[in-house]
Amino acid sequence: MAKTIKITQTRSAIGRLPKHKATLLGLGLRRIGHTVEREDTPAVRGMVNAVYFMVKVEE
């Protein structure tokens, strides 16, 4: 089974760059406090790194 990470949105997407909003939607995050579980792949890690200041990651 693939390793997974939990990603939680901690800050609002209002007033952010359109590509940051798109990245959050790509991760499946829709609102503050929303948590999703994703596979720990380089693609997902890259998306998290792009919006690191708006999310919290748990291994």
Curated annotation (Swiss-Prot):
Q: Which GO terms describe its biological process?
A: translation
Q: Which chain positions lie within coiled-coil regions?
A: none
What keywords sit in the KW lines? Ribonucleoprotein, Ribosomal protein
Q: Which InterPro entries match?
A: Ribo_uL30_ferredoxin-like_sf (IPR036919), Ribosomal_uL30_bac-type (IPR005996), Ribosomal_uL30_CS (IPR018038), Ribosomal_uL30_ferredoxin-like (IPR016082)
Annotated Gene Ontology cellular components are: cytosolic large ribosomal subunit
Annotated GO MF terms: structural constituent of ribosome
Q: Name one Pfam family in it.
A: Ribosomal_L30
- Judging by the UniProt lineage, the source's domain of life is Bacteria
- Known PANTHER family for this protein? LARGE RIBOSOMAL SUBUNIT PROTEIN UL30M, MITOCHONDRIAL RIBOSOMAL PROTEIN L30
| Family of the protein in this entry | Belongs to the universal ribosomal protein uL30 family.
Its quaternary structure? Part of the 50S ribosomal subunit.
Q: Can you say what this protein is called? A: Large ribosomal subunit protein uL30
Q: Quote the gene name from the UniProt entry.
A: rpmD
